[in-house]
Amino acid sequence: MKNILIFNDISGLGNCSMSANLPVFTKYGLYCMPVPTAVYSMQTGFDGFCVLPNVEAGAFAKKALALRSADAVYVGFCNDTATLSAVGDLLADNATKTAYKFVDPIMGDNGKL
């Protein structure tokens, strides 16, 4: 079974982000290693959402990669520059050097993709 390291946020309300990634990748026979980049009370399109501070995606991913190698890496929503920097460092690391890498622009394309 191939392993995929998934960086994305998770929301308590709103079936999107990590909640949508896991069943899709699992259906395709991949072993999922989810790494939350942010934890929200609800999807950010709802008014009044709140976010848990200081989600350490980089440290979380390093622990997972110490036990299992990644054949692929999926990068979804990163809510701040520190998280994006940690993910970038991991993508450059030897632990993910040979892994396929997929980056989802999460609407960063202004609707042009």
Regions found by a protein language model. Give the residues of each.
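Small-residue (G/A/S/T)-rich helix-start motifs and N-terminal tracts that mark the onset
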Residues: 1-71
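Conserved beta-alpha-beta core of the PfkB/ribokinase-like small-molecule kinase fold
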Residues: 72-113
